[in-house]
Regions:
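C-terminal motif of bacterial Sec signal peptides marking the signal peptidase cleavage site
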Residues: 21-24
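Hydrophobic helical h-region of N-terminal Sec-dependent signal peptides
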Residues: 10-18
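A residue-level marker of the well-folded mature domains of exported/periplasmic proteins
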Residues: 28-398
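Bacterial N-terminal signal peptides that target proteins for export
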Residues: 1-9
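Intrinsic low-complexity, intrinsically disordered segments enriched in polar/basic residues
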Residues: 3, 26-29
Length: 398
């Protein structure tokens, strides 16, 4: 335990950098039960706002108290935040960014009486800690659906004579060239291709999860390069704003941007983390085991779409999305069906992915089954890292 004087000094310093919110939810017998949340940014980031909304919704539903720390970097600050939440009496603590993982693992080792849950992480299934857990959702299904909406918009533009079939090029703003992002933009592209076979896509990376200027710059570059529709896996309003300014259709992520971008927003997919939070908090309250690796799905309500902006989307988009969603739920459509894409001109019949995330990034697990790449089957976090034909990377950022 740090000496009190040092703790006070650190607190005075940290208050300028980090934000802490204590939210009392409900007034039941569980109101004294505290749940900690660690977020990389604050509500100005669409990614973090999505987590914060889910945290508050889950705690409200369960009648427990949320203690929220925002603007926590992917470094020692995460461990410090976790330790402070333990000191504050939190019995279960969640963190929301990929780079938080090693610090959450260390906290789990140091505080074995507290449950630690990390969204987007990859190591829980190999760490073997009873109180450390990973969670993700099959968001590739949501991005595939969003891609279908994008492909329908491209078809509308082709039919109207605004572009030719060969000009049906989308742009995608990514944060990093990680499997999580690769899986997302590939599923989005395959969704579009399922209805617009001539589509191609350029991808540009910013090297940051949240940098509005860089995201806007990347989207503008893609538009100037001939991309007629833009999507993204980055967390600010940079790309949607660039699209609205240029009157280029946009498929956003982590929430609707229709209010700010009414003339270009089509639809958005997102993970609803509330089902996982409710599950994990309830298990912790009841002293029940929490899955080491939990994957939410369309069926659990963890993968959702916003309302479609029918003023911008192609006619029939809502009905088409309902049809494809039903087929995804029934297993009649596989997002990564190997018949629908090639790699270097060749069909894929076998592939080993790096599922266990060792230091050497060794490919350890066969992931092609029944003619499809089985994303999220062998761990919750994405491991699709193939560069398929039709997608052109303008740069890379690791």
């Amino acid at each position: 335990m740090k000496k009190r004087v040092l703790s006070v000094v650190l607190a005075l310093i940290m208050v300028f950098a980090f934000s802490v919110t204590l939210t009392g939810c409900g007034g039941g017998d569980d109101a004294g039960y505290k749940v900690g949340f660690i977020c990389l940014h604050d509500e100005n980031s669409t990614y973090d706002k999505n987590f914060l909304d889910a945290a508050n919704a889950a705690c409200e539903e369960l009648g427990v108290t949320a203690v929220i720390k925002t603007n926590i970097p992917e470094g020692q600050e995460c461990y410090d935040a976790a330790a402070e939440l333990v000191d504050a009496g939190c019995d279960i603590i969640f963190a929301n960014s990929f780079g938080h993982e090693d610090f959450m693992i260390q906290a789990a080792k140091d505080f074995p009486e507290v449950e630690f849950c990390h969204s987007t992480g990859t190591k829980a299934h190999t760490e073997g800690l009873d109180n450390y857990h990973n969670a993700f959702a099959s968001i590739y299904e949501g991005r595939y659906l969003a891609g279908v909406a994008a492909g329908m918009k491209l078809n509308e533009m082709i039919e109207a004579g605004d572009i030719t079939a060969s000009e049906a090029k989308m742009g995608y703003v990514g944060a990093f060239t990680y499997a999580e992002v690769v899986s997302g933009y590939t599923s989005f592209y395959l969704g579009a291709k399922s209805v617009c076979p001539s589509v191609t896509m350029d991808v540009s990376f910013t090297g940051s999860w949240y940098d509005e200027a860089l995201e806007k710059e990347a989207a503008t570059k893609l538009i100037k390069g001939g991309c007629v529709l833009i999507s993204q896996h980055a967390d600010s309003m940079g790309a949607p704003t660039a699209c609205e300014n240029a009157n280029v259709p946009n498929v956003s992520y982590n929430g609707s941007t229709q209010e700010a971008c009414p003339n270009t927003f089509i639809v958005s997919s997102r993970i609803d983390w509330a089902p996982y939070y409710v599950y994990a908090i309830t298990a912790a309250q009841n002293d029940e085991a929490i899955d080491a690796d939990w994957t939410g799905t369309l069926e659990t309500g963890s993968v959702v779409l916003t309302d479609v902006n029918t003023d911008v989307a192609a006619k029939g988009t809502v009905e088409k999305l309902e049809d494809v969603m039903a087929k995804l739920k029934a297993g009649d459509v596989e997002v990564f069906d190997a018949k629908t894409f090639t790699v270097d001109g060749k069909a894929l019949s076998s592939y080993k992915a790096d599922v266990d995330t060792d230091a050497a990034y060794e490919k350890d697990t066969e992931v092609i089954e029944d003619g499809a790449f089985k994303e999220s089957k062998f761990r919750s976090a994405p491991y699709f890292d193939l560069q398929i034909d039709g997608i052109n990377l303008l740069d890379t950022k690791f």
